[in-house]
Swiss-Prot record:
Belongs to the UDP-glycosyltransferase family. PANTHER family: GLYCOSYLTRANSFERASE (PTHR48048:SF45). CDD domains: GT1_Gtf-like. UDP-alpha-D-glucose binds at residues 284, 351-353, 368-376, 390-393. The lineage of its organism: Eukaryota, Viridiplantae, Streptophyta, Embryophyta, Tracheophyta. InterPro entries: UDP-glycosyltransf_plant, UDP_glucos_trans, UDP_glycos_trans_CS. Keywords: Glycosyltransferase, Transferase. This is UDP-glycosyltransferase 71B7. SUPFAM superfamilies: UDP-Glycosyltransferase/glycogen phosphorylase. Its EC number is 2.4.1.-.
Length: 495
Protein backbone atom coordinates (compact mmCIF):
# COMPACT_ATOMS: atom_id res chain seq x y z
CA UNK A 1 0.00 0.00 0.00
CA UNK A 2 1.31 3.43 -0.97
CA UNK A 3 1.19 6.18 1.60
CA UNK A 4 2.11 9.85 1.77
CA UNK A 5 3.24 12.36 4.39
CA UNK A 6 2.60 16.09 4.19
CA UNK A 7 5.59 18.09 5.45
CA UNK A 8 5.14 21.68 6.64
CA UNK A 9 8.50 23.36 7.34
CA UNK A 10 8.94 26.66 9.10
CA UNK A 11 9.30 29.45 6.48
CA UNK A 12 13.03 30.10 6.87
CA UNK A 13 15.91 28.88 4.71
CA UNK A 14 17.66 26.87 7.43
CA UNK A 15 14.53 25.02 8.50
CA UNK A 16 13.48 24.43 4.89
CA UNK A 17 16.85 22.90 3.97
CA UNK A 18 16.74 20.54 6.97
CA UNK A 19 13.17 19.51 6.15
CA UNK A 20 14.06 18.77 2.54
CA UNK A 21 16.99 16.60 3.65
CA UNK A 22 14.67 14.74 6.03
CA UNK A 23 12.12 14.20 3.26
CA UNK A 24 14.79 12.94 0.84
CA UNK A 25 16.07 10.49 3.44
CA UNK A 26 12.60 9.08 4.06
CA UNK A 27 11.69 8.54 0.40
CA UNK A 28 15.11 6.96 -0.21
CA UNK A 29 14.50 4.46 2.60
CA UNK A 30 10.87 3.55 1.85
CA UNK A 31 9.71 2.87 -1.72
CA UNK A 32 6.00 2.92 -0.76
CA UNK A 33 6.29 6.44 0.64
CA UNK A 34 5.79 9.75 -1.14
CA UNK A 35 6.01 13.22 0.39
CA UNK A 36 4.43 16.59 -0.35
CA UNK A 37 6.30 19.56 1.12
CA UNK A 38 4.14 22.67 1.56
CA UNK A 39 6.39 25.75 1.40
CA UNK A 40 4.82 28.69 3.22
CA UNK A 41 5.57 32.35 2.45
CA UNK A 42 8.76 33.42 4.23
CA UNK A 43 8.41 35.75 7.20
CA UNK A 44 11.52 37.77 6.40
CA UNK A 45 12.16 39.01 2.88
CA UNK A 46 15.57 38.71 1.33
CA UNK A 47 16.91 35.61 3.08
CA UNK A 48 20.16 34.75 1.32
CA UNK A 49 19.59 32.21 -1.46
CA UNK A 50 15.96 31.52 -0.53
CA UNK A 51 14.22 32.36 -3.82
CA UNK A 52 16.75 30.46 -5.95
CA UNK A 53 16.58 27.46 -3.64
CA UNK A 54 12.76 27.34 -3.70
CA UNK A 55 12.76 27.69 -7.49
CA UNK A 56 15.19 24.76 -7.76
CA UNK A 57 12.99 22.66 -5.47
CA UNK A 58 9.88 23.41 -7.53
CA UNK A 59 11.69 22.40 -10.71
CA UNK A 60 12.76 19.10 -9.13
CA UNK A 61 9.25 17.96 -8.10
CA UNK A 62 8.36 14.38 -9.03
CA UNK A 63 5.73 11.82 -8.06
CA UNK A 64 7.71 10.76 -4.95
CA UNK A 65 8.76 14.16 -3.63
CA UNK A 66 6.61 17.16 -4.51
CA UNK A 67 6.86 20.80 -3.50
CA UNK A 68 3.72 22.91 -3.15
CA UNK A 69 4.69 26.59 -2.94
CA UNK A 70 2.06 28.83 -1.36
CA UNK A 71 2.01 32.28 -2.94
CA UNK A 72 3.11 35.29 -0.90
CA UNK A 73 0.59 37.56 -2.66
CA UNK A 74 -0.85 40.07 -0.16
CA UNK A 75 1.61 38.77 2.41
CA UNK A 76 2.22 41.53 5.01
CA UNK A 77 5.73 42.18 6.31
CA UNK A 78 5.74 41.18 9.98
CA UNK A 79 8.11 41.10 12.91
CA UNK A 80 9.41 37.97 14.60
CA UNK A 81 7.09 38.55 17.57
CA UNK A 82 4.09 37.63 15.43
CA UNK A 83 5.19 34.16 14.28
CA UNK A 84 2.05 32.67 15.82
CA UNK A 85 -0.16 35.13 13.91
CA UNK A 86 1.74 34.39 10.70
CA UNK A 87 1.21 30.64 11.10
CA UNK A 88 -2.48 31.14 11.89
CA UNK A 89 -2.82 33.19 8.70
CA UNK A 90 -1.42 30.28 6.69
CA UNK A 91 -3.92 27.71 7.99
CA UNK A 92 -6.62 28.39 5.33
CA UNK A 93 -3.99 28.11 2.58
CA UNK A 94 -2.67 24.83 3.97
CA UNK A 95 -6.22 23.55 4.36
CA UNK A 96 -7.08 24.28 0.72
CA UNK A 97 -3.77 22.82 -0.53
CA UNK A 98 -4.38 19.54 1.31
CA UNK A 99 -8.03 19.44 0.18
CA UNK A 100 -6.91 19.82 -3.44
CA UNK A 101 -4.37 17.04 -2.93
CA UNK A 102 -7.09 14.72 -1.61
CA UNK A 103 -9.38 15.64 -4.50
CA UNK A 104 -6.67 14.84 -7.04
CA UNK A 105 -5.94 11.49 -5.41
CA UNK A 106 -9.62 10.52 -5.21
CA UNK A 107 -9.88 10.61 -9.01
CA UNK A 108 -6.74 8.56 -9.66
CA UNK A 109 -6.44 4.81 -9.17
CA UNK A 110 -3.53 3.52 -7.11
CA UNK A 111 -3.04 6.88 -5.41
CA UNK A 112 -1.30 6.95 -2.01
CA UNK A 113 -3.17 7.37 1.26
CA UNK A 114 -2.21 10.42 3.27
CA UNK A 115 -0.74 9.07 6.49
CA UNK A 116 -0.26 12.30 8.40
CA UNK A 117 1.40 15.69 8.71
CA UNK A 118 5.06 16.16 9.67
CA UNK A 119 5.35 19.61 11.22
CA UNK A 120 8.30 21.82 11.96
CA UNK A 121 8.77 22.66 15.65
CA UNK A 122 7.48 26.20 14.94
CA UNK A 123 4.45 25.05 12.90
CA UNK A 124 2.59 23.22 15.65
CA UNK A 125 -0.61 25.22 15.16
CA UNK A 126 -1.08 23.13 11.99
CA UNK A 127 -2.03 20.22 14.28
CA UNK A 128 -5.52 21.70 14.23
CA UNK A 129 -5.64 21.48 10.43
CA UNK A 130 -4.44 17.87 10.51
CA UNK A 131 -7.14 17.05 13.06
CA UNK A 132 -9.82 18.53 10.79
CA UNK A 133 -8.83 16.00 8.11
CA UNK A 134 -8.53 13.18 10.65
CA UNK A 135 -4.78 12.81 10.12
CA UNK A 136 -2.21 12.22 12.86
CA UNK A 137 0.59 14.75 13.35
CA UNK A 138 4.30 14.08 13.74
CA UNK A 139 7.04 16.63 14.32
CA UNK A 140 10.49 17.22 12.88
CA UNK A 141 12.61 18.84 15.60
CA UNK A 142 15.67 20.56 14.15
CA UNK A 143 17.43 21.23 17.47
CA UNK A 144 18.84 18.87 20.10
CA UNK A 145 16.87 16.36 22.15
CA UNK A 146 18.25 18.19 25.18
CA UNK A 147 16.51 21.50 24.51
CA UNK A 148 13.33 19.59 23.61
CA UNK A 149 13.36 17.93 27.04
CA UNK A 150 14.08 21.24 28.80
CA UNK A 151 11.17 22.92 26.98
CA UNK A 152 8.86 20.12 28.12
CA UNK A 153 10.01 20.56 31.72
CA UNK A 154 9.63 24.35 31.68
CA UNK A 155 6.10 23.93 30.32
CA UNK A 156 5.26 21.48 33.11
CA UNK A 157 6.65 23.86 35.76
CA UNK A 158 4.66 26.75 34.27
CA UNK A 159 1.46 24.71 34.31
CA UNK A 160 2.07 23.93 37.99
CA UNK A 161 2.97 27.58 38.77
CA UNK A 162 6.44 26.49 39.90
CA UNK A 163 8.52 28.35 37.31
CA UNK A 164 9.58 31.62 38.89
CA UNK A 165 12.37 32.76 36.57
CA UNK A 166 12.24 36.54 36.25
CA UNK A 167 13.20 38.28 33.02
CA UNK A 168 14.58 41.19 35.03
CA UNK A 169 17.18 39.27 37.01
CA UNK A 170 17.77 35.87 35.39
CA UNK A 171 21.02 37.03 33.75
CA UNK A 172 22.50 37.74 37.21
CA UNK A 173 20.89 34.85 39.06
CA UNK A 174 23.04 32.34 40.95
CA UNK A 175 20.18 29.83 41.03
CA UNK A 176 20.20 26.51 39.20
CA UNK A 177 17.46 24.37 37.71
CA UNK A 178 17.53 20.59 38.08
CA UNK A 179 16.23 19.29 34.79
CA UNK A 180 15.71 15.51 35.06
CA UNK A 181 17.00 14.98 31.52
CA UNK A 182 20.41 16.50 32.33
CA UNK A 183 23.08 14.97 34.54
CA UNK A 184 24.25 18.36 35.89
CA UNK A 185 22.41 21.31 37.48
CA UNK A 186 21.61 23.96 34.88
CA UNK A 187 22.45 27.61 35.75
CA UNK A 188 19.45 29.92 35.36
CA UNK A 189 21.73 32.56 33.80
CA UNK A 190 22.40 30.10 30.93
CA UNK A 191 18.72 29.90 29.97
CA UNK A 192 17.86 30.83 26.39
CA UNK A 193 16.23 34.26 26.45
CA UNK A 194 12.98 32.80 25.11
CA UNK A 195 12.56 30.69 28.26
CA UNK A 196 12.84 33.75 30.51
CA UNK A 197 11.38 36.66 28.53
CA UNK A 198 7.81 37.67 29.34
CA UNK A 199 7.03 38.12 25.65
CA UNK A 200 8.43 34.78 24.48
CA UNK A 201 7.86 32.33 27.34
CA UNK A 202 4.09 31.89 26.72
CA UNK A 203 4.80 31.17 23.04
CA UNK A 204 7.23 28.37 23.83
CA UNK A 205 5.05 26.95 26.61
CA UNK A 206 2.12 26.76 24.17
CA UNK A 207 4.38 25.07 21.64
CA UNK A 208 5.42 22.47 24.20
CA UNK A 209 1.76 21.67 24.90
CA UNK A 210 1.29 21.09 21.17
CA UNK A 211 4.40 18.88 21.09
CA UNK A 212 2.58 16.51 23.43
CA UNK A 213 -0.18 16.02 20.85
CA UNK A 214 2.22 14.50 18.33
CA UNK A 215 2.24 10.80 17.44
CA UNK A 216 6.03 10.88 17.30
CA UNK A 217 8.96 13.28 16.99
CA UNK A 218 11.88 13.00 14.57
CA UNK A 219 14.92 14.68 16.14
CA UNK A 220 18.09 15.74 14.35
CA UNK A 221 20.42 14.10 16.85
CA UNK A 222 22.28 10.84 17.41
CA UNK A 223 21.49 8.27 20.10
CA UNK A 224 25.16 8.04 21.01
CA UNK A 225 25.44 11.83 21.37
CA UNK A 226 22.57 12.39 23.82
CA UNK A 227 22.01 9.03 25.55
CA UNK A 228 21.09 10.49 28.95
CA UNK A 229 18.44 12.80 27.48
CA UNK A 230 16.97 10.16 25.17
CA UNK A 231 16.75 7.62 27.97
CA UNK A 232 14.77 10.13 30.01
CA UNK A 233 12.45 10.98 27.11
CA UNK A 234 11.79 7.30 26.41
CA UNK A 235 10.57 6.81 29.99
CA UNK A 236 8.45 9.97 30.21
CA UNK A 237 4.82 10.57 29.24
CA UNK A 238 5.78 12.38 26.04
CA UNK A 239 5.49 11.22 22.41
CA UNK A 240 8.12 8.73 21.20
CA UNK A 241 11.34 10.31 19.94
CA UNK A 242 13.23 9.04 16.89
CA UNK A 243 16.89 10.23 16.81
CA UNK A 244 17.62 10.12 13.06
CA UNK A 245 20.62 12.46 12.71
CA UNK A 246 23.02 13.85 11.99
CA UNK A 247 20.97 15.27 9.14
CA UNK A 248 23.34 17.58 7.26
CA UNK A 249 23.23 19.48 4.00
CA UNK A 250 26.63 18.31 2.78
CA UNK A 251 26.11 18.81 -0.94
CA UNK A 252 27.79 21.77 -2.61
CA UNK A 253 25.37 24.69 -2.37
CA UNK A 254 26.25 26.17 -5.72
CA UNK A 255 26.24 29.92 -6.01
CA UNK A 256 28.04 31.18 -9.11
CA UNK A 257 28.65 34.58 -7.53
CA UNK A 258 30.63 32.93 -4.75
CA UNK A 259 32.45 30.19 -6.66
CA UNK A 260 35.66 32.20 -6.98
CA UNK A 261 35.60 33.10 -3.28
CA UNK A 262 35.10 29.44 -2.40
CA UNK A 263 38.00 28.34 -4.59
CA UNK A 264 40.28 31.02 -3.15
CA UNK A 265 39.50 29.90 0.42
CA UNK A 266 39.97 26.21 -0.32
CA UNK A 267 43.22 26.84 -2.21
CA UNK A 268 44.57 28.72 0.81
CA UNK A 269 43.55 25.92 3.17
CA UNK A 270 45.15 23.30 0.92
CA UNK A 271 48.50 25.04 1.47
CA UNK A 272 48.28 24.76 5.29
CA UNK A 273 49.53 21.84 7.43
CA UNK A 274 46.95 19.33 8.75
CA UNK A 275 44.94 20.43 11.82
CA UNK A 276 46.82 23.75 11.99
CA UNK A 277 44.07 26.31 11.27
CA UNK A 278 41.49 27.67 13.70
CA UNK A 279 38.27 28.59 11.88
CA UNK A 280 36.02 31.36 13.26
CA UNK A 281 32.48 31.55 11.89
CA UNK A 282 29.24 32.60 13.59
CA UNK A 283 26.39 31.72 11.25
CA UNK A 284 24.27 33.84 8.93
CA UNK A 285 23.02 36.06 11.77
CA UNK A 286 26.26 36.34 13.74
CA UNK A 287 28.22 39.59 13.60
CA UNK A 288 30.22 41.85 15.92
CA UNK A 289 30.87 45.51 16.60
CA UNK A 290 34.27 47.15 16.22
CA UNK A 291 35.37 46.77 19.85
CA UNK A 292 34.76 43.02 19.85
CA UNK A 293 36.42 42.62 16.46
CA UNK A 294 39.61 44.21 17.79
CA UNK A 295 39.66 41.88 20.80
CA UNK A 296 39.35 38.85 18.51
CA UNK A 297 42.14 40.16 16.27
CA UNK A 298 44.48 40.69 19.23
CA UNK A 299 43.75 37.17 20.49
CA UNK A 300 44.42 35.58 17.11
CA UNK A 301 47.71 37.39 16.68
CA UNK A 302 48.89 36.56 20.19
CA UNK A 303 47.96 32.89 19.85
CA UNK A 304 50.34 32.43 16.93
CA UNK A 305 48.00 29.88 15.35
CA UNK A 306 47.01 29.94 11.70
CA UNK A 307 43.46 31.19 11.29
CA UNK A 308 40.58 31.58 8.85
CA UNK A 309 38.21 34.25 10.15
CA UNK A 310 34.73 34.82 8.72
CA UNK A 311 34.29 38.41 9.87
CA UNK A 312 30.95 40.18 9.61
CA UNK A 313 29.57 43.45 10.91
CA UNK A 314 26.73 43.22 13.44
CA UNK A 315 23.31 44.28 12.18
CA UNK A 316 21.44 47.03 14.05
CA UNK A 317 18.19 45.10 13.44
CA UNK A 318 18.64 41.42 12.64
CA UNK A 319 15.07 41.05 11.31
CA UNK A 320 15.43 43.82 8.74
CA UNK A 321 19.06 43.36 7.76
CA UNK A 322 21.45 40.44 8.11
CA UNK A 323 25.07 41.06 9.20
CA UNK A 324 27.20 42.41 6.37
CA UNK A 325 30.75 43.33 5.46
CA UNK A 326 32.79 46.10 7.07
CA UNK A 327 33.45 48.93 4.62
CA UNK A 328 37.12 49.29 5.58
CA UNK A 329 38.72 46.54 7.66
CA UNK A 330 41.94 48.52 8.00
CA UNK A 331 40.05 51.03 10.15
CA UNK A 332 38.49 48.33 12.34
CA UNK A 333 41.40 45.95 12.95
CA UNK A 334 44.51 46.88 14.97
CA UNK A 335 47.02 48.92 13.00
CA UNK A 336 49.37 46.67 11.02
CA UNK A 337 47.31 43.52 11.73
CA UNK A 338 47.26 42.34 8.10
CA UNK A 339 51.00 42.86 7.64
CA UNK A 340 51.88 40.97 10.82
CA UNK A 341 49.54 38.02 10.13
CA UNK A 342 49.74 37.75 6.33
CA UNK A 343 51.71 34.48 6.49
CA UNK A 344 49.42 32.69 8.95
CA UNK A 345 45.92 34.14 8.60
CA UNK A 346 43.12 34.94 6.20
CA UNK A 347 40.17 37.24 6.91
CA UNK A 348 37.07 36.61 4.79
CA UNK A 349 33.41 37.58 4.73
CA UNK A 350 31.07 34.79 3.64
CA UNK A 351 32.41 31.27 4.29
CA UNK A 352 31.49 27.92 2.69
CA UNK A 353 31.31 26.38 6.16
CA UNK A 354 30.84 22.73 5.24
CA UNK A 355 33.68 22.79 2.71
CA UNK A 356 35.94 24.51 5.25
CA UNK A 357 35.18 22.07 8.08
CA UNK A 358 35.79 19.16 5.70
CA UNK A 359 39.30 20.40 4.88
CA UNK A 360 42.12 18.53 6.71
CA UNK A 361 43.85 21.83 7.56
CA UNK A 362 41.11 22.79 10.05
CA UNK A 363 42.10 21.96 13.62
CA UNK A 364 39.49 23.89 15.60
CA UNK A 365 36.24 25.81 15.17
CA UNK A 366 35.14 28.89 17.15
CA UNK A 367 31.37 28.77 16.69
CA UNK A 368 28.08 30.33 17.76
CA UNK A 369 26.86 26.81 18.67
CA UNK A 370 23.98 26.66 16.20
CA UNK A 371 22.81 23.04 16.20
CA UNK A 372 23.58 22.47 12.51
CA UNK A 373 27.09 23.88 13.00
CA UNK A 374 27.54 21.68 16.06
CA UNK A 375 26.57 18.55 14.13
CA UNK A 376 28.77 19.53 11.18
CA UNK A 377 31.80 19.96 13.43
CA UNK A 378 31.21 16.56 15.02
CA UNK A 379 30.72 14.91 11.63
CA UNK A 380 34.11 16.15 10.47
CA UNK A 381 35.79 15.53 13.83
CA UNK A 382 36.65 19.19 14.49
CA UNK A 383 36.65 20.30 18.17
CA UNK A 384 34.85 23.55 18.95
CA UNK A 385 35.11 26.58 21.22
CA UNK A 386 31.65 27.74 22.28
CA UNK A 387 30.58 31.35 21.69
CA UNK A 388 26.73 31.35 21.83
CA UNK A 389 24.92 34.41 20.47
CA UNK A 390 21.16 33.77 20.25
CA UNK A 391 18.21 31.35 20.36
CA UNK A 392 19.02 28.04 22.12
CA UNK A 393 22.78 28.41 21.63
CA UNK A 394 23.52 28.99 25.34
CA UNK A 395 21.97 25.60 26.00
CA UNK A 396 23.94 23.99 23.17
CA UNK A 397 27.14 25.44 24.65
CA UNK A 398 26.29 23.99 28.07
CA UNK A 399 25.49 20.63 26.50
CA UNK A 400 28.72 20.46 24.51
CA UNK A 401 31.05 21.82 27.22
CA UNK A 402 29.57 20.69 30.54
CA UNK A 403 27.44 17.65 29.75
CA UNK A 404 29.41 16.00 26.96
CA UNK A 405 32.96 17.38 27.17
CA UNK A 406 33.03 17.86 23.38
CA UNK A 407 33.92 21.58 23.34
CA UNK A 408 36.03 24.11 25.22
CA UNK A 409 34.53 27.19 26.82
CA UNK A 410 35.52 30.77 26.13
CA UNK A 411 33.59 31.98 29.15
CA UNK A 412 31.11 30.22 31.40
CA UNK A 413 28.25 32.71 31.34
CA UNK A 414 27.09 34.88 28.45
CA UNK A 415 25.09 38.07 28.73
CA UNK A 416 22.86 39.51 26.02
CA UNK A 417 21.03 38.04 23.05
CA UNK A 418 21.47 38.99 19.38
CA UNK A 419 17.89 38.29 18.26
CA UNK A 420 16.34 40.11 21.21
CA UNK A 421 18.59 43.12 20.67
CA UNK A 422 20.06 42.78 24.16
CA UNK A 423 23.66 44.08 24.33
CA UNK A 424 26.35 41.45 24.72
CA UNK A 425 29.34 41.97 26.99
CA UNK A 426 32.68 42.25 25.21
CA UNK A 427 34.79 39.10 25.42
CA UNK A 428 38.40 40.04 26.12
CA UNK A 429 41.40 39.10 24.03
CA UNK A 430 42.80 37.20 27.02
CA UNK A 431 39.69 34.99 27.25
CA UNK A 432 39.67 34.31 23.52
CA UNK A 433 43.40 33.57 23.33
CA UNK A 434 43.18 31.14 26.26
CA UNK A 435 40.31 29.27 24.59
CA UNK A 436 42.11 29.10 21.23
CA UNK A 437 45.26 27.68 22.85
CA UNK A 438 43.16 25.03 24.59
CA UNK A 439 41.15 24.31 21.44
CA UNK A 440 44.23 23.74 19.28
CA UNK A 441 46.00 21.30 21.64
CA UNK A 442 46.63 18.30 19.42
CA UNK A 443 46.46 15.62 22.12
CA UNK A 444 43.70 17.08 24.30
CA UNK A 445 40.95 14.94 25.81
CA UNK A 446 38.35 17.07 24.02
CA UNK A 447 39.93 16.35 20.63
CA UNK A 448 40.01 12.61 21.39
CA UNK A 449 36.36 12.59 22.47
CA UNK A 450 35.32 14.54 19.36
CA UNK A 451 37.13 12.06 17.11
CA UNK A 452 35.38 9.17 18.86
CA UNK A 453 31.97 10.86 18.56
CA UNK A 454 32.62 11.60 14.88
CA UNK A 455 33.09 7.89 14.24
CA UNK A 456 29.87 7.12 16.13
CA UNK A 457 27.96 9.68 14.04
CA UNK A 458 29.12 8.02 10.83
CA UNK A 459 28.26 4.53 12.09
CA UNK A 460 24.79 5.74 13.17
CA UNK A 461 23.87 6.41 9.52
CA UNK A 462 25.09 3.04 8.25
CA UNK A 463 22.85 -0.01 7.86
CA UNK A 464 22.17 -1.32 11.35
CA UNK A 465 23.26 1.98 12.91
CA UNK A 466 21.16 3.68 15.57
CA UNK A 467 19.80 6.46 13.33
CA UNK A 468 18.96 4.09 10.47
CA UNK A 469 17.15 1.83 12.93
CA UNK A 470 15.21 4.76 14.42
CA UNK A 471 14.20 5.94 10.95
CA UNK A 472 12.90 2.49 10.06
CA UNK A 473 10.91 2.34 13.31
CA UNK A 474 9.33 5.68 12.45
CA UNK A 475 8.34 4.46 8.97
CA UNK A 476 6.83 1.29 10.44
CA UNK A 477 4.89 3.34 12.99
CA UNK A 478 3.46 5.59 10.27
CA UNK A 479 2.41 2.56 8.21
CA UNK A 480 0.84 0.93 11.27
CA UNK A 481 -1.17 4.08 11.99
CA UNK A 482 -2.66 3.94 8.47
CA UNK A 483 -4.09 0.51 9.24
CA UNK A 484 -5.48 1.83 12.54
CA UNK A 485 -7.07 4.80 10.76
CA UNK A 486 -8.67 2.52 8.15
CA UNK A 487 -10.18 0.36 10.90
CA UNK A 488 -11.56 3.45 12.64
CA UNK A 489 -13.16 4.66 9.39
CA UNK A 490 -14.64 1.19 8.75
CA UNK A 491 -16.06 1.14 12.28
CA UNK A 492 -17.65 4.57 11.80
CA UNK A 493 -19.07 3.52 8.41
CA UNK A 494 -20.68 0.39 9.91
CA UNK A 495 -22.43 2.52 12.51
Amino acid sequence: MKFELVFIPYPGIGHLRSTVEMAKLLVDRETRLSISVIILPFISEGEVGASDYIAALSASSNNRLRYEVISAVDQPTIEMTTIEIHMKNQEPKVRSTVAKLLEDYSSKPDSPKIAGFVLDMFCTSMVDVANEFGFPSYMFYTSSAGILSVTYHVQMLCDENKYDVSENDYADSEAVLNFPSLSRPYPVKCLPHALAANMWLPVFVNQARKFREMKGILVNTVAELEPYVLKFLSSSDTPPVYPVGPLLHLENQRDDSKDEKRLEIIRWLDQQPPSSVVFLCFGSMGGFGEEQVREIAIALERSGHRFLWSLRRASPNIFKELPGEFTNLEEVLPEGFFDRTKDIGKVIGWAPQVAVLANPAIGGFVTHCGWNSTLESLWFGVPTAAWPLYAEQKFNAFLMVEELGLAVEIRKYWRGEHLAGLPTATVTAEEIEKAIMCLMEQDSDVRKRVKDMSEKCHVALMDGGSSRTALQKFIEEVAKNIVSLDKEFEHVALK
